[in-house]
């Protein structure tokens, strides 16, 4: 069962159609690593994360940000089954990577911030409410494998 109204789905999909995954993905993951520096420990193989400029200019950060937002695009296509959509990723992040599930919530909130910056007046309070609901649903789905 979905908690998303028709209005939520319309707000999410119409904004998503405008999102440049490459730009928004790198910006979102980069900001996560700058604002919440303890998250950097999951990205040891990314090279220098020694300063905000190093993080924001890091091609591996940008590439992984694209991967994250591409995955989010799949969620947007499957809003009625977020848990099913993220089953394998939840297992990977829980069992192999041991990512604190709180980080999923933080990433979602950073994404909402990035969307607000990129889309300004289009990112109305109603659109934000729909996106907050969606990123909370994604965070919950990603945390579903945790005990």
Swiss-Prot record:
Single GO molecular function: oxygen carrier activity
Annotated signal sequence range? none
Q: Which SUPFAM superfamilies match?
A: Globin-like
Q: Which Pfam families did the record assign? A: Globin (PF00042)
Q: Which UniProt keywords apply?
A: Heme, Iron, Metal-binding, Oxygen transport, Transport
Q: Work out whether the entry's keyword set contains Metal-binding.
A: yes
| InterPro entries hit by this protein | Globin, Globin-like_sf, Globin/Proto, Hemoglobin_b, Hemoglobin_oxygen_transport
All copies of domain Globin, residue ranges: 3-147
Record's family? Belongs to the globin family.
Q: What does this protein do?
A: Gamma chains make up the fetal hemoglobin F, in combination with alpha chains.
Provide the protein name.
Hemoglobin subunit gamma
